[in-house]
Amino acid sequence: MKTSTIPTLLGPDGMTSLREYAGYHGGGSGFGGQLRAWNPPGESVDAALLPNFTRGNARADDLVRNNGYAANAIQLHQDHIVGSFFRLSHRPSWRYLGIGEEEARAFSREVEAAWKEFAEDDCCCIDVERKRTFTMMIREGVAMHAFNGELFVQATWDTSSSRLFRTQFRMVSPKRISNPNNTGDSRNCRAGVQINDSGAALGYYVSEDGYPGWMPQKWTWIPSELPGGRASFIHVFEPVEDGQTRGANVFYSVMEQMKMLDTLQNTQLQSAIVKAMYAATIESELDTQSAMDFILGANSQEQRERLTGWIGEIAAYYAAAPVRLGGAKVPHLMPGDSLNLQTAQDTDNGYSVFEQSLLRYIAAGLGVSYEQLSRNYAQMSYSTARASANESWAHFMGRRKFVASRQASQMFLCWLEEAIVRRVVTLPSKARFSFQEARSAWGNCDWIGSGRMAIDGLKEVQEAVMLIEAGLSTYEKECAKRGDDYQEIFAQQVRETMERREAGLKPPAWAAAAFESGLRQSTEEEKSDSRAA
């Protein structure tokens, strides 16, 4: 008895079963089998990152040090996220703390004044190494996060009694965080980070600076926080999934392209130099066999004499009748020689278009616009430039919120705790919670960095004015977009107005015109209202 076979339904290609063809193609062999050899393993982020972690960061370091585009990408992050001054805008959660809004504002003014004196001291007392102000530390942290994927800051205590505040900070390179004695990873110790069963960091193993290399390497274990809740070691990175222990640098997705672009540029430059090096060549009628006899057979005395004699004859001839290209003399060559002029060839040969394509790919991977990365703003309209700047601005604002502000806020909390203990600033007496009970509420703050790039200053100002007049924005938000604090702007305007009045100066013409226009409009509205009544 014959067993009947059920026919298999095939897809449009006539080879793949219809069941497989109707599913997600990404998990199959693809059309024509293009994906059949693509079988990446399914790994956790630590399994994919940590085995080659040191080498990947070393390559990123090399790119930033020796590649102009990579260095520019880091500079863009520093300039657009932090800028020249990272300004504190302290705003405690006064409703939660049970204090009045005016009390909270008065407390914030005291805190901001004391913090600025401590953080931006020219003597750099905030830094253990006495090299950085607070803004410089934030800029370094942003750069560190950009090309290493994470940043580390150690909160320390100055034992000397020469200064009011003892709180200090040390920037720690990610290269110094590693397992003791370079041992392998374990379940609770990965890449220098000791974690609990839930994945929370308990402490970090920090090695001493190994330079110049002959000194024995030592590791120190530093807890992530002290028993009282004070941060001891600040670690900031953006995890992409659960269980991630260390941060991945942003260059991983474009590292190969950046390195190949660097090699391509060097090769293109060498090619251009070689093509421009020779204006003309003199070709001799000496055949290949004779030339090889001269060159390869020069070990014998006879061949050396023949080669020396031949070169001597040529040198003597052209010494008596030199060949010149820049003069008016028409050269008369040695019999059998020919002069060939080398025309300059196009050294580009489609290279610029190919370079732009690579740079667009790299810019997309780094989160910046092509124009900012390449510094090429040619052939751009205002709308195109504005759209490109807004895309990058959204990326930079995310990094400011989750990287720079997190680092700054944790450093600020360490200082604020000491400032309260030393009574440099005094908590409102009617507060519901103490500092230890509500650290986040007392230390809640925003950070104002560099302003958004203005493509057209006039249009940017008009937009801000219209948003405020329409009630869709506030002076605080619009000033923050420009990198300014609205309270400082208002206070300065009041001082300038009073000084101009005392000096007998009239208000600016535009201010007077705006005031008269507003007064005229208000009068007309009142008249129309009275008529309607």
Protein language model regions, located:
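Charge-rich, acidic-biased intrinsically disordered regions
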Residues: 39, 132-138, 155-172, 287-300, ...
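Activation/maturation switch segments at domain boundaries
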Residues: 2-3, 337-348, 390, 458-533
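Surface-exposed loop-to-helix/strand elements on domain peripheries
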Residues: 128, 328-455
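Structured, mid-chain assembly/scaffold modules that mediate subunit interfaces
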Residues: 76-239, 467
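N-terminal-proximal low-complexity accessory segments that begin disordered
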Residues: 1-101, 531-533
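Short, Φ-rich (hydrophobic/aromatic) sequence segments
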Residues: 67-98, 137-146, 251-271, 280, ...
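Extended, charged amphipathic alpha-helical segments
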Residues: 233-388
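Short coil/turn segments at secondary-structure boundaries
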Residues: 155-157, 273-279, 373-377, 477-482, ...
